[in-house]
C-alpha cells in the first residue's frame, strides 16, 4: 500500500513539475496513510512513549501530556470535518456510532488506548477527541518506587496485603494514575488464581494466565442490548472467580462489589474517584444507595467496614508526579462510624516550596489491623518489619 501511494505521489509531483524534497514527499505519504488508516495528524503522538494523553480541541488545538504536564503541540487538522472524520473512524472500528444524533462516545484504539469523543453542537468550539494512551510497557510497583511514586516499604506492605488477599480500593482524581497503580498491584496475584476483570473500556494488563476479561456494552439506537457493569459483576459471581477486579466503581454496581467481597471473593480490587480515603468511603455509601435506597446508612457502613480492608490514595501533584499519598486501613466500626488508620502518608515539605514537590513517605508505625490475618499467612513478621521507620 505504501509503495503504491509513494508512486502516485511521485507521479503527481512529476506531472505538475513541483519542487519537493524527498523528506517532504515522505511527509506527504505519511499524512495520507495516517488519514486513511490511522488517526490523522495525531498518529505520531501515539508512537511517542513520553506522551500519556492526547487532547484535541477542534481542528486548531492539539495538547499532549508529557511527564505530568500539558503542552500545546504545533499539530493541526485541516478543519472540523477532518476531526469528525477521524472520530467516526475510531468509533466505527469498535462497532460504535458517533454523529449529531449520538454526539458522545467512548471507544478504544487497536493498541488499547482509551478514547472519548464529543461532537458539535455539544462541543461548541469544534469536535473534541481525548485519548488516554495504553501503556506499552508493563509497570511494576518496584519501578514505581524507583520513580518516586511510593516508597520501597510501601511496596513490601502492598505485596503482603495482596498475598493476604485483602480487598483493596484505589482512590484518586481523574488522571491521577489509579489504573496504572491497579495494574502494578495485580502483579502480586498468584498465577494459579482465576481472575475476572470488569471494565467499561478495557485497560487492565494482567499478566496471569487465567484471566477472563469482560467489557460493558452500551445500548443500541433502540435502547436495547446494553450490558452494564452491574450485570457483569452479578454474572462474574457465577464464573467461579478467585478474585474480581473492577476497573472503576462508579454506580450501583458498588452494592454487588461489596457483596462479592463479603462472600468469599477476597483479594478483589477496584478504583474509585475520590480525593481522600474518607471521601472514598462516602462515595461508596452513595453508590450503594443508588442500588438499594432502603438500606439504613449504618448497615451500608457495616458492609463497607467488613468488605474493604485497605484504601490507597493516589494523587497527581503540582509537579506532575503521581504519588501514593496514603495507605489507609479500614479498622472496623465504632458506633455508626467507619474507623480508619493510616499506615503510610506522604508528608511534603511546605518550607521548601519549589516547582518540584519535596517530601517523604512516612510510616505511622501503627500495628496494622490485618496483622492477625498476616500471621495466618506466615507474614506477620515481614509486615511489622516493613512498617518500621
For the regions a language model picked out, list residue spans one by one.
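NTP-binding/hydrolysis catalytic cores, primarily Walker-type P-loop NTPases
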Residues: 320-389
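N-terminal anchoring/assembly modules that precede and organize ATP-driven motor systems
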Residues: 1-71
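Hydrophobic anchor at the beta1->P-loop junction of P-loop NTPases
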Residues: 170
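P-loop NTP-binding catalytic core
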Residues: 48, 61-164
